[in-house]
Design a protein with these regions (language model features):
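Active-site beta->alpha loop and helix N-cap motifs at the rims of alpha/beta catalytic domains
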Residues: 2-3, 14-132, 142-146
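Proline-centered loop/turn at the N-terminus of a beta-strand
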Residues: 17, 75-77, 136, 197-199, ...
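Catalytic alpha/beta core domains of metabolic enzymes, predominantly
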Residues: 111, 116-250
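Hydrophobic anchor at the beta1->P-loop junction of P-loop NTPases
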Residues: 258
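P-loop (Walker A) phosphate-binding loop of NTP-binding proteins
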Residues: 261
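ATP-binding Walker
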Residues: 264
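Walker A/P-loop
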Residues: 267
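Conserved substrate/cofactor phosphate-moiety recognition/catalytic segment
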Residues: 271-298
Length: 298
């Protein structure tokens, strides 16, 4: 089992922790959302600074000071998601570098999200400076329009580990059930090959199941919706906790039936539940056809 300590929290690939984002656009919104998020009792909080109305370090630091007063000792991820990876704002590489390093030096965030794969030209030095400042790094990579191949998923996660990321995160957008499987199998393979813990997810409704099967894929963190969602497909923290809290041993003597229209993801969810619980997966349509053995028309 992989483990990494973040603040007072132990992350492990056998027990995914739940992170809730704060996406306020100004000081008052950030504080208001923070108070509501704290009431949800998340394991981790993420502040999406790209939603914030300023990128000046003095204003960001003042915001972090006030935010820390509200969230107390809950571990904090500082994230400025760039527009190139689905974020709210453009920022130059130099400004992105300086912002992340300066935030790390404040000591107000335990984890700094670094888009390590797409910014590999500056990532190595940035990660080294963040580590020197005493913070840990989530190396991240996001694909909002596609799902890369399984091989690319593995290669991307391993590259971010080589760049020095303490945790390696990848989020992709599926267009079909096969895309979700690529993410699941790619995550499992990467987790077996890597030393660093991983965080992976397939976004949108189609990929929602990947947010709750971290015990299978190896993800140490899953993201749930706060006051507002920060990515497609996020469930509420209550929904995520209810599913993650299922004891697989308690349901092995029961059956689960998936009912829905064609193309709604029944097969994908059934397969994922099968991975998690060890229960056999039966395609009822195929089963009925086999049992009926309808003869060809004469």
């Amino acid at each position: 089992m992989k483990q990494i300590k973040v603040g007072n929290l132990e992350l492990s690939d056998g027990h995914p922790k739940v992170c809730v984002p704060i996406v306020g656009e100004n000081h008052d919104e950030v504080i208001e959302q923070a108070k509501k998020v704290v009431e949800m009792n998340p394991d981790i909080i993420e502040w999406r600074c790209d939603f914030f109305d300023s990128v000046y370090i003095d204003e960001v630091e003042n915001m972090l000071i006030d935010l820390r007063e509200v969230i107390k000792d809950i571990p904090l991820i500082f994230t400025f998601r760039t527009d190139g990876e689905g974020g709210e704002k453009f920022i130059s590489n130099n400004s992105y570098y300086d912002l992340n390093v300066q935030v790390a030096k404040t000591g107000l965030a335990e984890l700094i999200d670094v888009e390590a794969y797409s910014k590999d030209s500056i990532a190595l030095d940035m990660i080294e400076e963040i580590h020197t400042a005493g913070a840990k790094v989530i190396g991240s990579n996001h694909h909002f329009n596609e799902t890369p191949t399984r091989e690319k998923i593995v290669e991307t996660l391993m590259t971010m580990e080589e760049l020095g990321a303490d945790i390696c995160k990848m989020a992709v957008m599926p267009s079909c059930e096969e895309d979700v499987k690529e993410l699941v199998y790619g995550s499992i393979e990467a987790n077996e090959k890597m030393i660093a813990p991983i965080v992976t997810m397939s976004m949108g409704e189609l990929g929602a199941v990947t947010r709750v099967c971290g015990k299978t894929t190896g993800s140490v963190i899953t993201f749930a919706a706060g006051v507002n969602t920060s990515a497609p497909g996020q469930m509420t923290i209550k929904q995520v906790r209810n599913i993650l809290g299922i004891n697989c041993d308690d349901i092995k003597d029961k059956n689960i039936f998936m009912i829905g229209f064609m193309g709604t993801g029944k097969t994908t969810i059934s397969n994922a539940l099968g991975y998690i619980t060890g229960m056999p997966v039966v395609d009822i349509d195929k089963y009925i056809e086999e049992q009926e053995k309808v003869p060809d028309e004469v």
